[in-house]
Design a protein with these regions (language model features):
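Extracytoplasmic metal-acquisition and chelation regions
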Residues: 1-230
Length: 230
């Protein structure tokens, strides 16, 4: 598709992080090829997840981590087992509710028929895998450093060539780079430039000290839905 073709030209700047979605495009092909596609997609996802540490962006994966913490705490402090279990159960119920909210948007019967997201940070493979969201990463403007003018120009080129109207930015991305991208994507079709929506990976403490995992994951969901129009 167009995204893949562009990726061949600029491998260092654009990456499709959710190869598993290729099998949805291939449903119309011969059944004999279906297993091969599934095998390829599973291998691609295993490779993506192996190099992506952001497992907590999948609420069910995070729930497994909570259970692991619970197991270790009750081993270390058996006298507090009842308290630990009660607290864990209450928190897990909230994680299950969060998962339900994401499924309401991104399941087969969810409200978001479009689930292709163009982002600036390759951090969302676990979320993509759980909720069938396709994340396309535009490299060079990630939050780890200050993007160069060339990095910004490459991002702008991709956004314009692919008619991207919404760009998802990780919270701590350079504000100057974000402003430059918006300014350079201004056109008659987008008088205000590309729309920016923020996503929170929680690699650093939140800028708002009142936020926590649950509130930031809800913000991620709200912003995903806002950008996708669902």
């Amino acid at each position: 598709d167009d995204h893949d073709a562009h990726g061949e030209d600029d491998d260092d700047h654009v990456e499709n992080n959710s190869e598993v979605h290729d099998d949805h495009d291939a449903h119309g092909e011969d059944d004999d090829d279906h297993d091969d596609h599934d095998d390829h997609d599973e291998e691609g996802h295993e490779e993506d997840l192996a190099f992506d540490p952001h497992s907590w962006l999948d609420p069910l994966a995070f729930k497994a981590q909570v259970n692991l913490v619970l197991e270790n705490l009750t081993t270390l402090f058996p006298g507090q087992e009842a308290t630990f279990k009660a607290n864990a159960a209450a928190y897990i119920a909230q994680l299950d509710g969060l998962h339900t909210d994401y499924e309401a948007a991104f399941s087969d019967t969810g409200t978001c028929s479009n689930s292709t997201v163009v982002a600036n940070h390759a951090a969302y493979n676990y979320m993509a895998n759980r909720y069938d969201i396709e994340f396309i990463t535009v490299h060079g403007v990630d939050p780890e450093g200050e993007p160069t003018a060339e990095d910004v120009a490459m991002a702008v080129e991709y956004l314009q060539e692919e008619d991207v109207s919404v760009f998802y930015i990780e919270e701590f991305t350079s504000p100057d780079a974000v402003k430059s991208i918006v300014d350079q994507t201004t056109s008659s079709a987008m008088p205000s430039g590309v729309s920016i929506q923020y996503l929170y990976t929680m690699e650093l403490p939140p800028s708002n000290s009142d936020d926590d995992y649950l509130s930031l994951m809800q913000k991620n969901l709200v912003n995903l839905k806002a950008g996708l129009g669902c």
